[in-house]
A protein has these predicted regions:
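Short hydrophobic core segments
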Residues: 9-11, 117, 138-149, 183-184, ...
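Beta1/beta-strand and adjacent pyrophosphate-binding region of the FAD-binding site
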Residues: 2-14, 177-187
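FAD-site-proximal beta/loop scaffold in flavoenzymes
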Residues: 161-178, 262-340, 422, 426, ...
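Flexible, glycine-rich terminal cap/loop adjacent to redox cofactors
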Residues: 9-37, 43, 50, 54-61, ...
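Glycine-rich dinucleotide-binding loop and its adjacent helix/turn
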Residues: 49, 148-203, 207, 235-236, ...
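Short glycine/serine/threonine-rich phosphate/pyrophosphate-binding segments
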Residues: 16-23, 43, 165, 190-193, ...
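A Rossmann-like FAD-binding core segment of flavoenzymes
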Residues: 76, 99, 111-114, 118-132, ...
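Glycine-rich flavin
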Residues: 2-6, 23-29, 35-177, 210-214, ...
Length: 479
């Protein structure tokens, strides 16, 4: 049977793949989307971003954490949370998001093929269908986008055959909330899950080979988050690693650490990074290669070494975020078909970390600016100085703005606290438009809102700058 002809084949229906498919379809192209699982959305929607953030909100709701912060007392009624309570809302949100993405693909006329895609040659992809067994469909296109995402790494030291030893994908299938949990890896995923389970009253041990929490963050945010996590009861094991893990059928799982310490816990969650399965695509038949980590090298347009084959998302490595993957997919599709609608990634890419408390940032940290030789002034506003912050009971959150000292142009925004991942967008848009301190002073924010923190932090920066440059008074138009 001859191959079905398309303008574009996309392999992988995560954020990057769906964005590429939708964009090409909107450009009037015939698009085929290949997805090995039954659900559209990839890891972001089905096992990663959306599920974990939904679980976080559920954990906060049923644990009474927010109520304790607001009223200063424990007003929670339910003392024992069941795993069904934790997962019910997650299942609904995940299914709804996946369905919505599929509905849009159908509306755009994208042909979706269920199965595993492999290259037969640089322009042909064979789809092996799960049902009926042995069924295949060959697809052919002038342009191809690879967006197969990533999978959790599984270090050999951990017995994943045990139902109580999980990677970050499998955690969604736990059958009971453990009394104690060891989280291996204090990266973004490990830290988020550690906070979530600690909120539910689980004794959490967080083990990491580094000596600092999320060192890519502004140090003030990293230190504040570490303090908050320790107050939740999370125990950190820094500069350490697991050398042995024994998981009997019953009883506690035993961990032996390189430091000589031993831990006994109910469950283990391994968050040791993610890797790609790009080698399973038979890339050699298409003419491009992969790195030892399974990543696909690309240029600034997300082209592989084969000019008509693109790769986006986790399969190309950092930053491996759902938001940036979608951006990459749009850029790749536009470049493939000569459209100028989206020629490059956004200049500034925000990061959101859904720990408890939430953390978000965009742009330069104070240290990064200084490394670039830029003299800076930093303004800070604490949530407990803001009426909205007081109303919601957030006593530890803060907003930190990094300005260029010379002209007070905004260079970076760093937030920790309630709604941090939303609040950062005010600064993000200001940076996208080249905004400076005057923008925030000229803006009228609703009252009371956390957005007003921008005005307070800007005042702080202006006063500090006045002290630095020796001015007793600073006029509104003379920054």
């Amino acid at each position: 049977m001859p191959a079905a002809e398309f303008d574009l084949i996309v392999i992988g229906a995560g954020p990057g793949g769906v964005a590429a498919a939708d964009t090409a379809a909107l450009l009037g192209k015939r698009v085929a989307l290949v997805e090995r699982t039954a659900a559209i959305g990839g890891a972001a929607v089905n096992t990663g971003t959306i599920p974990s953030k939904t679980l976080r909100e559920t954990a906060l709701a049923i644990s009474g954490v927010k109520a304790r912060a607001l009223f200063g007392v424990d007003v929670s009624v339910r003392r024992e949370a069941k795993v069904e309570d934790l997962l019910r809302h997650e299942r609904l949100v995940t299914a709804s998001e996946s369905h919505q993405m599929r509905t849009l693909l159908d509306r755009y006329g994208v042909a979706v093929y269920r199965g595993t895609g492999t290259f037969l040659d640089p322009n042909t992809v064979r789809v092996a269908h799960p049902s009926p067994p042995g069924g295949v469909t060959d697809l052919r296109a002038d342009k191809i986008v690879v967006a197969i995402g990533s999978v959790p790494m599984r270090p050999a030291v951990f017995p994943f055959e045990s139902p109580r030893v999980h990677d970050s994908d499998e955690l969604l299938y736990i059958t009971a909330i453990p009394r104690s949990l060891a989280v291996i890896g204090a990266g973004v995923i490990g830290s988020e899950y550690a906070c979530m389970f600690a909120a539910l009253g689980v004794r959490v041990h967080l083990i990491d080979g580094r000596d600092a929490l999320l060192p890519f963050l502004d140090p003030d945010l990293s230190n504040a988050l570490k303090d908050a996590m320790e107050k939740q009861g999370i125990v950190f094991w820094w500069k350490d690693q697991v050398e042995a893990c024994t998981a009997p059928r019953s009883g506690e799982i035993e961990l032996r650490l390189a430091s000589g310490n031993e831990l006994a816990v109910d469950n283990v969650l391994v968050c040791a990074g993610r890797t790609s399965a790009a080698a399973t695509l038979a890339p050699e038949r298409a003419g491009f290669g992969v790195t030892p980590r399974g990543l696909i090298p690309v240029d600034e347009h997300f082209r592989t070494t084969v000019p008509h084959i693109y790769a986006v998302g986790d399969v190309i490595g950092f930053p491996a975020l759902a938001s940036t993957s979608a951006e990459q997919g749009r850029v790749a599709a536009c470049h493939a078909f000569g459209s100028h609608a989206k020629e490059a990634l956004a200049q500034f890419l925000p990061a959101g970390i859904y720990t408890i408390p939430e953390v978000s940032s965009v742009g330069l940290t104070e240290a990064q600016a200084k490394d670039k030789g830029i003299a800076v002034v930093v303004g800070r506003a604490d949530y407990d100085q803001n009426p909205r912050g007081k109303i919601i009971g957030d006593k530890t959150g803060f907003l930190k703005l990094v300005f260029a000292r010379e002209d007070l142009k905004l260079l970076g925004v760093h937030v920790i606290g309630e709604q941090a991942s939303e609040l950062v967008h005010i600064g993000l848009i200001a940076m996208m438009t080249g905004g400076d301190a005057n923008l925030f002073l000229a803006t009228c924010f609703n009252y009371p809102t956390l957005g007003d923190l921008y005005k307070l932090a800007t005042h702080d920066a202006i006063l500090k700058r006045a002290e630095l440059v020796g001015k007793a008074q600073v006029g509104l138009s003379r920054w």
